[in-house]
């Protein structure tokens, strides 16, 4: 059993015959690895969980991040963002390969990976950083490529294309950063006719380099994943949207408060 005042929002990650799950946030935060067929626990890693937020407790910390599994050089690494740090585990044994300090207490989105770099970001005006993967032990001094101590509040996860990281912030601003330097290339506000531009959802990147996003005002945006911002379309569904857009078989699925939408060619 797990409880946090803001709820839980992580998803299981399936890789081969294994399932990985960040069971948190909450007092019993644990990263689990299960056998996909039997449900047997193969290994588990415990992380400090903080308070649940009930009864006036204010030690609010936690990670809503999903782990991601990537090939980094000669090995696979299970990459994870936690309060205070980013880290990597051996997906077979659960052994911690490396850790890098720098994140703040609240981690809302999942890490992303490209070109040997893990991009990890805190929420609530916290820090962001890039880490060279493939290390061992505490790599804060050696492998932390860049570090920004305070960035805009973001809840949804970003995407990477051609050496640039794109994310839609809580306030409805599209950010683009160079993944090797952390330099902010652009930040552009996107706003439709909906009553609010606030955003909690993650971006979706298509194979042809287009980003799709939806905000809480029910506005959906399509823009190019290029270092020069180009908004291609804005469409309003007329209802509140909090969840991220899902993609399957060439179709977009959007869950609103009233309807489930499917967008694609007939």
Report the location of each language-model feature.
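Noncatalytic, solvent-exposed loop/strand surfaces
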Residues: 1-266
């Amino acid at each position: 059993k797990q409880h946090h005042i803001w709820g839980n929002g992580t998803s299981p990650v399936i890789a081969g015959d294994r399932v990985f799950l960040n069971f948190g946030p909450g007092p019993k935060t644990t990263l689990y690895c299960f056998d996909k067929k039997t449900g047997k626990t193969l290994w588990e890693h415990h992380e400090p969980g903080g308070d649940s937020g009930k009864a006036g407790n204010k030690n609010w910390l936690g990670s809503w991040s999903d782990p991601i599994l990537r090939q980094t050089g000669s090995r696979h690494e299970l990459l994870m963002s936690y309060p205070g740090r980013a880290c990597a585990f051996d997906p077979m044994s659960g052994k911690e390969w490396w850790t890098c300090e720098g994140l703040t207490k609240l981690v809302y989105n999942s890490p992303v990976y490209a070109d040997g770099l893990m991009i990890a970001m805190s929420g609530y005006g916290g820090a962001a950083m890039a880490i060279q993967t493939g290390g061992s032990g505490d790599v804060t001094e050696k492998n932390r490529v860049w570090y920004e101590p305070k960035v805009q509040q973001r809840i949804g996860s970003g995407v990477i294309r051609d050496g640039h990281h794109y994310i839609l912030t809580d306030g409805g601003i599209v950010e683009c950063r160079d993944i090797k330097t952390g330099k902010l290339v652009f930040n552009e506000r996107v706003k439709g006719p909906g009553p609010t531009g606030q955003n909690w959802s993650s971006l979706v990147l298509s194979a042809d380099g287009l980003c799709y996003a939806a905000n809480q005002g029910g506005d959906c945006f399509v823009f190019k994943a290029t270092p020069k911002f180009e908004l291609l379309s804005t469409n309003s569904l007329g209802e509140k949207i909090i969840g991220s857009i899902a993609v399957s078989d060439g179709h977009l699925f959007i869950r609103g408060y009233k309807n489930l939408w499917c967008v694609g060619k007939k």
